[in-house]
């Protein structure tokens, strides 16, 4: 479709009207360029897909919404906007689209959040009830759906009242009533525990109401994980050919895709035996009480028992083999080099893939048959079986995918990382098997790039080391396929608005020197606090261990520090804003996650402290396997993995400072390697152009090291 004169005029008119809605609106050349580039791509005038880096201040959200809505209307398609996290998803849904509705009054939009963000009205009814008899219909859930105390029951009753009177849409983020994670776990549900159309509350369920709204909406705000799942199952979203897709925070897409395709399952032999026994009893109950018209051959008891016995024997053999690779009687992990399994293990995985797929098919057949049963049956008993069969289906579906992935030598032209872990839970050791592909470009090509005609991938940071090459390698987007890559200029004058400060540290921030380095950092930080030049400050660390050591050096300043983990992030930011607005000094302290999505302007944040260059951890099975694979191709893992990732992290961290034309301040980076190592210049060259200063560091007093036991963390 060509960009007609009428379409261009519509886009221009909306853009002009938008300027009147936003106080102190500043027209910016990069924003106009982005609107034009997005329009040309979505209309099919230029290229297949567009990856466009839009630095802070460009106004990227409105720059893709305006042309996206115009072209979606012209082509009678749905515009799907996908983000990486709920916070940005909600911002677009609750702020940006309502703003556009002021200039496009008939605009219809909705949001597609994950099932776990919505309340389950069935569970809410049970938890809000004061009469045990009212919960009888919910007894089939096999879950504890009773309030822990009277206060919790009253809170649930208030939530139910708000839901029933349409004061609340059922989204966790859209109520002011405090809901802790434990309560929300019981209030919400997942796919395996949802009765879907069989549920009494189906028509009024917030999750399904939102899903039905998608059919009528012109704009749907989703998230990357949901989009990936929808493209895989051809559900929720419109047909790929009938939608336009914008992937905001697009730099997260490869990781989200990899997470979605990672498979893990418990394979502890006694536990597995129990699951198989429960399934055979479940099938027997279905055959006895809700016999299907056509009997599946595998449902015949003798055949099913033999099938499950073979499956168990293979699992038991796999347990014995995997345990030989790990020290006995303790938590442990074993990774298979280059993802290559011994022949014996590979043969077991291939057979397990077939056997679990057959059980998945059997569970699906029974589930479909149960869902079609009429009201002449005992509804409570029927629903209990539906839930149990749904959970069995979920288990065998995951197992089937796991063993299929384990049977593959490669995925997207790269090895599949495969490893086993032994973990202790409630005094018992459990064995798990894990698989994940190093590259997901083939899957992204199949699900997105080849299926949807035109896609916009955007973010404030898409490049690392001034190059799109890492994004291209990880995502599968490529110029020879007609994809375009554009980096817009920043609208800010960084050279005048701020500077980079690299203190003359005596040591590098290595593990061996960490204590002395932290002591020097704390001394310089204390000097900055005492100067009282800055009200709002941010301190970012590469690890929780380093952050805690730093806090040990500044205990006397603790009241001014708002530390990640003390409270939810949004509350820390709210408190920080209030303090600075009242003329008080306030310091946010956190890890890399604090470097993304934090938007504090002017005095709210005028000094950013960065502990060190944040190279990615090199001890995860995925990173180690990727390193082995790169070396086998005569590629240098540091250049391909570590340096681009560190550059990306540093760009994001530095990007917290200048958020508007009125912002000013300093970025303090406590890492001399930026000036002493060859790669340091490349990292600095990828940052906005700031003047650089190198002040002296006051003497730091190194505290005596205390032996601390590092907490074990699950690695991927």
From Swiss-Prot:
Residues binding ATP, per UniProt: 54-61
Motif range (DEAH box): 131-134, 248-251
Keywords: 4Fe-4S, ATP-binding, DNA-binding, Helicase, Hydrolase, Iron, Iron-sulfur, Isomerase, Metal-binding, Nucleotide-binding
Entry binding sites for [4Fe-4S] cluster: 120, 194, 199, 205
Annotated PROSITE patterns: HELICASE_ATP_BIND_2, HELICASE_CTER
Catalysed transformations (reactions): Couples ATP hydrolysis with the unwinding of duplex DNA at the replication fork by translocating in the 5'-3' direction. This creates two antiparallel DNA single strands (ssDNA). The leading ssDNA polymer is the template for DNA polymerase III holoenzyme which synthesizes a continuous strand; ATP + H2O = ADP + phosphate + H(+)
Biological process, per Gene Ontology: DNA repair; SOS response
InterPro entries attached to this UniProt entry: ATP-dep_Helicase_C, DEAD/DEAH_box_helicase_dom, DinG/Rad3-like, DinG_proteobact, Helic_SF1/SF2_ATP-bd_DinG/Rad3, Helicase-like_DEXD_c2, Helicase_ATP-bd, P-loop_NTPase
A Pfam family this chain is assigned to: Helicase_C_2
Cofactor: [4Fe-4S] cluster
Molecular function GO labels: 4 iron, 4 sulfur cluster binding; 5'-3' DNA helicase activity; ATP binding; ATP hydrolysis activity; DNA binding; DNA/RNA helicase activity; metal ion binding
EC number(s) recorded for this UniProt protein: 5.6.2.3
Note accompanying the cofactor annotation: Binds 1 [4Fe-4S] cluster.
Ranges of residues in domain Helicase C-terminal: 517-698
Protein family: Belongs to the helicase family. DinG subfamily. Type 1 sub-subfamily.
Physiological role: DNA-dependent ATPase and 5'-3' DNA helicase. Unwinds D-loops, R-loops, forked DNA and G-quadruplex DNA.
UniProt-recorded name of the protein: ATP-dependent DNA helicase DinG
Species assigned in the record: Escherichia coli O157:H7
